[in-house]
Amino acid sequence: MEPYALGTLGYTLDPGIPGDKLEAIREAMDFAISHTNTLGAFSGNVYVTYGAGTPTADASYRGQIRFGGSIGRRVALHELAHWFGSGTTDEWDRLVRDGRFIGTRTVTRITAFDGPSAYLNAGGYHFWPYGLNYDNEFSDTQRNTQLVSTQVADMGLGQDVTAAIAGTRRFQNRSSRHVLQSVVSAGYPSEAASVTGGTQEWRVTFADGFITLANGADGRMIKATASGDNAAAMMATADGSTAQQWEMMPTGDGWFLLRNRATRNCLDNIGDLAAGAPVRLWGCGWHPNQQWRLIR
């Protein structure tokens, strides 16, 4: 079983970065690059430098990211948005009207996240919500990356590469190292010790930042039954409900949570590491029991 990411985005560190700044910059960029590659087929190489006179940080379109007075994971993700063209291109300016970003893909994505009346504020070089403009905004970071991807597509600078998750996938749990499966005779998802066939394959569909997981053996989908801790996950025929939709939330190094759209709890083995044990639902955190990665 080999782990992999959807994207190939990388970065190069300026050899002149001061030694007392280097480790913090490397840690921030490692997280931001892994986070981004987990969510989509992003590509390119970011040149990363440091400027003692830079108040916080800045970036140019497909050029460099320069850290200054602010170094951290949030800052790295925020500047990556600028590197991809958000707020740094003429195409961005043409799609900002009356303080809102009006690109159709982005409008569809933000309303999927926040409801039919939602819109993406935009002004100067920045957007909000999910712009990661301040330290108190460092949550739901996956939505920042999702919205940057749609902005790139709206601006005509590339595709919505977060859609690359669609296809046949396998998922491995971090704590058990077992593979997500659905036994045809069972009514719930579980874990297998090894890859043996279609029961560990999942046909992933993607729409507006959310995915569905249909088992390769019988086509049934993973569905949440309730909110809260230790709620059951079940296998059910496709019904189009938000209880069958999941949001990938990167935690680092290619791992991610799968948060249900309806109940907002996450797929979790709840500490039962035995092969065949049911996968259930638990309030989302960073525990290895609820972290997953793609394998092949």
Predicted features along the sequence, with ranges:
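Short alpha-helical catalytic segment bearing the HExxH-like zincin motif
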Residues: 71-80
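Catalytic Zn2+-binding segment of zinc metalloproteases
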Residues: 80-97
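Lectin-like carbohydrate-binding module/patch detector with strong preference for beta-trefoil
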Residues: 162-296
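Metalloprotease/metallohydrolase-associated module, dominated by Zn2+-dependent proteases
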Residues: 93-165
